[in-house]
């Protein structure tokens, strides 16, 4: 039996970048995991790793175009940086990012969130249980 995402759930996201190699290096440092390069039609992507099987949310970095551009406004994606928010924030800064919202505790059992500016000018959310 193949797992599928629940109906009406988010299944894909794209983070626009102006320099794919630079952004891939940044996100690999932030997450401590490699991104996979793929070419889909005319677009080259750097795909985020997943560990939740077919039902997990998938996404990528893609070169910006006339339709998209890096931005600190608009929809915000939150990436799981478990097990440690503190370690992830340190990696983000070391890789050239900047913290825009420091670590914030959520209600008991929900972990922590923070927000960063990536190396491309996007504001990205981070979430971790620790």
Language-model regions, residue ranges each:
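Residues in well-ordered beta-strands of folded domains
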Residues: 49, 62, 78
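A short, structured beta-strand/loop element
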Residues: 56-63
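Core segments of cupin and vicinal oxygen chelate
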Residues: 7, 14-56, 107
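Conserved active-site tyrosine of GNAT-family acetyltransferases
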Residues: 23-27, 92, 121
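Short, flexible, solvent-exposed loop/turn segments with mixed acidic/basic and small polar residues
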Residues: 1-4, 65-69
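Vicinal oxygen chelate
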Residues: 1-18, 36-39, 66-130
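Residue-level detection of beta-strand scaffold positions
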Residues: 27-30, 45-47, 76, 89, ...
